[in-house]
Amino acid sequence: MKFTLSWLKDHLETDASLEEICARLTMIGLEVEDVDDKAAFKPFVIARVISAEQHPNADKLRVLMVDTGSGEPVQVVCGAPNARKGLVGAFAAPGTYVPGIGVTLSVGNIRGVESRGMMCSEKELEISDDHTGIIDLPEDAPLGTSYADYAGLDDPVIEINLTPNRPDCTSVHGIARDLAASGLGTLKTRPAPSFAVEGETPVKVRLDLGEDRHLCPGFALRLVRGVKNGPSPAWMRQRLTAIGLRPINALVDITNYLTFDQGRPLHVFDAAKVAGNLTVRRAREGEKVLALDTREYTLSPANVVIADEEGVESIGGIMGGEHSGCDENTTDVLIESALWDPMNIAKTGRTLGIITDARYRFERGVDPEYMAPGLERATELVLELCGGTAAKMDVVGYDGHEPRSVDFPVSEVRRLTGLEVSSEESVSILRKLGFGVEGSGERLTVTVPSWRPDIDGRADLVEEVMRIHGVDNIVAAPLASHNAVNGKILTTLQIRTRQARRALATRGMLEAVTWSFIPEGHAKLFGGGQPELKLANPIAADMSDMRPSLLPGLLAAAQRNADKGYGDVAIFEVSGTYEGDTPEAQRRVAGGVRRGTASLNGTGRLWSNAVKGGGKPVDVFDAKADAIAVLEACGVPMANVQFEAGGPAWYHPGRSGTIKLGPKIVLGAFGEFHPKTLDALDVSGPLAGFEIYIDAMPEPKKKATRTKPALELSPFQAVKRDFAFVVDKGVEAAAIVRAASGADRKLITAVNVFDVFEGASLGEGRKSVAIEVTIQPVERTLTDEDFEALTARIVANVAKSTGGVLRA
């Protein structure tokens, strides 16, 4: 939002300097982004060329004698094609800095002729890009005076960075209101427009929107006859130029001026070019309009237009049509002031790719109560600058604004901000901002003004009081220090999430972040696809469903790496999956995928390429080891964990497993992927993966503490004994491990399987499972008798649990 200092002072009575105004704007939340102060133009003066002779040594140069108003002519060498006797322009003396060329002038010698200054073009003064000739001013321009003063370039331009929730400050008047409320001056009030009206406006307006009346809640129209449309006055042209707008003609400039002055976008139609009455309606499919930017737009029923009997004349709230635009031949003009639905304006603007000052304001919300007064003010300016006779205003559809009231306890200011603001000051601030305030003491009833659609509740009112009172008045204070140990900062779920990440990274896996949205087919393949998990507005057709599992995204990521030459990858993710649309149906899961030879010691491990090209393909045991690593890192009691053969349908039925804690708690699953799953996802293997449900893990029995438990070490040497048991093929190795561990849980610290053998010598349907048992004495060195007794218990436990016998 741009405006000039003098423009602001049309609305604000203040003696504050430019620096004070900019500082206060930033303090009250209207951040000043840039200040363009043309004070550097002061040295440029208005001068007249009193003679122009051909340069003796150059065909394209002329030697000018220039009257700068000082009484003594100055010689200047100039190459501008329009340099001539009698021309009045802007002169720069030696020592003047010329911003357009970045040079400080000095007395020069050009092809043997001395030059003591420069006649400047608009580009050299950075007024425009025009450098075809030097500035050509009217003959009555006062010689010797500052060109900046004459051209209005002495007026600093302030640009503020508006947040979307402040539509009231898309006008100079709204900005002045905020400054006045902060104590920097007094807000000026303009008397209501007063002018004579004659007759009715013959062009009628019909709102043809059916049940979608919200698309155009109000429409006001007035005819002004007998106008003379020429250039707008210099003061208006200067202000529009200063903020980057191009003056066109008086009628158009008035609408642009009021857009910034009052935040009220308007539009003018040449009445002679409008066929019959106007209708506000949805555009028809494929309907076209040639807009004022000379571009043709193809419309759809999603767009709201203003049309006459022959077609579209304007894209409502965004841009008018070229056909009914006003030019120097316009004598009768229709002035329109309307209200438009912000959401529809935003969608139409994005769809058509049109950015205008009107769209900028309507999509944020304009003051509905200023629709008719804005038209009155525009009419007043048209009559003042263009003459003519105004007809009566015709208002259609507007039912008035229903003000909102907010119950406001004054103590909320202190509770939410820490500021001590008295009730009287809070009331004063709100009233200066235009709020209606009733009541006294602690509780107030505040009525929100029509120009503040962003105010919705108490917190918004607190913000208003805080920013006007001054954010810099908040006293910095350290947090209270209590001589006690801080409570637990992270939840158990957060701690376990961190532990899972570290454990998997330690195993050489790389963390990935995949989309939470996946194709519907992939979701159904992994147990999802429920209607409540479909996205209402997906960002892409293949991102339609919330994921029920991390594995589809990880498998796709692994395949993308393989397609680019990185086939041996090991990646993991710890994130959320979704079984329903309730908070309880969102799960925290640690999942991972290994591809190719990316086992723990394979090529997928970042710090070891020892077996590159000859590594063993990943299998179910790699995935199982990863899953166990997560469980151990999260503190799950592994002695109670059970592994069952078989997993979900997306795993290979004979090369997968399910991890349980008791009969009901499922901790996760792992395995190699089913060939049908890989085909459906269009990925190639070998691939193995796992998922661990972190939120299914039971809470630790011991209370969380920052203190690590004491490390208990035995002074006695650990002893390892090997056993080989012959069992039926259907017996799981885990059953043998559990049975051996149960022989003496105090002395036996680890049981590991190191060999499985099947052969004819063992008999039909039999196999040999070899285990290594680690025995750790605690209180004393064990005797041979102790080892023999423990060995007997191990053999007996395995025989009882599995029917296994020691292999001879």
UniProtKB/Swiss-Prot annotation:
Stretches assigned to the tRNA-binding domain: 38-148
Cofactor binding remark: Binds 2 magnesium ions per tetramer.
InterPro entries: aa-tRNA-synth_II/BPL/LPL, B3/B4_tRNA-bd, DNA-bd_dom_put_sf, Fdx_antiC-bd, Fdx_antiC-bd_sf, NA-bd_OB-fold, Phe-tRNA-ligase_IIc_bsu, Phe-tRNA-ligase_IIc_bsu_bact
Enzyme class name: ligase
Domain of life: Bacteria
NCBIfam families: pheT_bact, YtpR
Cofactor(s) named in the record: Mg(2+)
Protein's name in the database: Phenylalanine--tRNA ligase beta subunit
Keyword Magnesium tagged: yes
Keywords: Aminoacyl-tRNA synthetase, ATP-binding, Cytoplasm, Ligase, Magnesium, Metal-binding, Nucleotide-binding, Protein biosynthesis, RNA-binding, tRNA-binding
GO biological process, any: phenylalanyl-tRNA aminoacylation
FDX-ACB domain ranges (all copies): 714-807
A GO term for molecular function: magnesium ion binding
Domain B5, chain residue ranges per copy: 401-476
EC number: 6.1.1.20
Residue numbers binding Mg(2+): D454, D460, E463, E464
Keyword Ligase: yes
Membrane-spanning intervals of the chain: none
Catalyzed reactions: tRNA(Phe) + L-phenylalanine + ATP = L-phenylalanyl-tRNA(Phe) + AMP + diphosphate + H(+)
GO cellular component terms, semicolon-separated: phenylalanine-tRNA ligase complex
Subcellular location(s) of the protein: Cytoplasm
Stored Gene3D superfamilies: 3.30.56.10, Bira Bifunctional Protein, Domain 2, Ferrodoxin-fold anticodon-binding domain, Nucleic acid-binding proteins, Phenylalanyl-trna Synthetase, Chain B, domain 3
Quaternary structure and partners: Tetramer of two alpha and two beta subunits.
A Pfam family hit: tRNA_bind
Similarity comment text for this entry: Belongs to the phenylalanyl-tRNA synthetase beta subunit family. Type 1 subfamily.
